Amino acid sequence: MDIETKKVIEQILDNNKIVLFMKGSKLMPMCGFSNTAIQILNTLNTDYFTYDILENENIRQAIKEHSSWPTIPQLYINREFVGGADIMLELFEQGELQAQVETLLAA
């Protein structure tokens, strides 16, 4: 990962409490997993930032390196990597994702 790409990722994570690196946008997810992630986040009724990795190949590869996770989408809460769509769904079904967001908003 080059220094400039690392800086971009760090800036995105620094400037946003909840970040979803995904394929496509909130309004037009470009894969089923990104769509699942968006649906989960929309259910939480909170603000979140999305980054379309299809717009930048360097970010697309670097975010996988940054998280040591091979797939997209990737959710970060308070700079911490949470997981992809399956982990998000599992945490959501257990009420843990909502709890993480509520803790973040209460801080």
From Swiss-Prot:
Chain residues that bind [2Fe-2S] cluster: 31
One of the record's GO cellular component terms: mitochondrion
Chief location: plastid
Keyword Iron: yes
A matching Pfam family: Glutaredoxin
SUPFAM superfamilies named in the record: Thioredoxin-like
Superkingdom of origin: Eukaryota
InterPro entries tied to this protein: Glutaredoxin (IPR002109), GRX_PICOT-like (IPR033658), Monothiol_GRX (IPR014434), Monothiol_GRX-rel (IPR004480), Thioredoxin-like_sf (IPR036249)
Matching Gene3D superfamilies: Glutaredoxin (3.40.30.10)
Keyword entries, A-Z: 2Fe-2S, Chloroplast, Iron, Iron-sulfur, Metal-binding, Plastid, Redox-active center
Record-linked NCBIfam families: Grx4 family monothiol glutaredoxin
Family, per entry: Belongs to the glutaredoxin family. Monothiol subfamily.
UniProt protein name: Uncharacterized monothiol glutaredoxin ycf64
Organism phylogeny: Eukaryota, Rhodophyta, Bangiophyceae, Bangiales, Bangiaceae
